[in-house]
Design a protein with these regions (language model features):
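Compositionally biased, intrinsically disordered low-complexity regions
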Residues: 14, 176, 225-226
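Short, flexible loop segments at boundaries between secondary-structure elements
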Residues: 72-80, 165-198
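Extended, charge-rich low-complexity interaction segments
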Residues: 199-226
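Low-complexity, intrinsically disordered/propeptide-like segments
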Residues: 132, 178-180, 193-194, 207, ...
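Feature targets compositionally biased, intrinsically disordered low-complexity regions
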Residues: 58, 173, 182-185, 206, ...
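A polyanion-binding, active-site-adjacent surface
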Residues: 1-169
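Secondary-structure boundary elements
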Residues: 139-143, 196-204
Length: 226
């Protein structure tokens, strides 16, 4: 019988990984590094990237199930046809990612590698990888604010609080923000209000934008209700 390969752990997910797995992990890292801001204003955190490399957020993604509604709700427009009618789909998506970067946004993953279907439950992944994420936040990302995305990150929110990040968490009534879903107007209103509630800082570098709305504008987005 042929012996099982003795694979080393992947530093992205902590699990034994084949050379093919490591190569894909490095490719995802390369894609995300292209759009990482020098100073991260809002760090969005989701559980894991898409299963297909072609659908990686920073690819940019071929599938728009997450990509399009996420950037739409951040009011990063898809394309100005009058200004540049010749742009193709890839160029348009890349321009949106560049604007995402320009605003100081960054999307990070608890597990930097996809979680296979029928893999471990989210709670297990969170318990296993949260110490690594917390180290990355503290010593690498150093964001001004953290916005967890997805209700499956419930236990991660508590761990981030215990780690001392409570004052910079952007939440919905104490919970992680809902993950993007196409056509869900209620989610879009909720997400916009939560991110818009992040107060501006006086020490933002030149050209560094963030969502800043007045109370009146916030009420208008919420349908005119206070």
């Amino acid at each position: 019988m042929e012996a099982s390969p003795n694979y080393l752990p992947c530093d992205g997910c902590g699990l034994p990984a084949s050379p093919e797995h490591i190569a894909e992990r490095l490719r995802r890292l390369e894609l995300s590094t292209r759009y990482r801001p020098v100073h991260i204003g809002v760090l969005f955190v989701v559980l894991a990237p898409s299963l297909r490399l072609e659908d990686d957020f920073y690819g940019p993604a071929e599938s728009k199930e997450f990509f399009a509604p996420f950037l739409d709700v951040l009011e990063i427009p898809p394309h100005d046809e009058k200004a540049a009618p010749e742009l193709d789909a890839l160029a348009i998506a890349s321009a949106r990612l560049a604007e995402f970067q320009h605003r100081g946004y960054y999307l990070a993953y608890l597990s930097e590698c996809p979680i296979p279907e029928n893999g471990e439950p989210p709670a297990t992944t969170i318990a296993r990888l949260s110490p690594t994420l917390i180290r990355r936040i503290r010593f690498n990302y150093k964001p001004k604010y953290i916005a967890p995305l997805g209700q499956e990150l419930f236990s991660l929110v508590d761990l981030l609080r215990v780690a001392g990040f409570e004052s910079i968490l952007t939440l919905d009534q104490g919970l992680a923000l809902p993950s993007p879903s196409t056509g869900d107007r209620g989610w879009m209103d909720l997400f916009q209000k939560a991110v818009a509630s992040v107060p501006p800082r006086d020490n933002l570098s030149s050209g560094y934008d963030r969502i800043q709305v007045t109370s009146a504008e916030r009420d208008l987005r919420a349908g005119g209700h206070s």
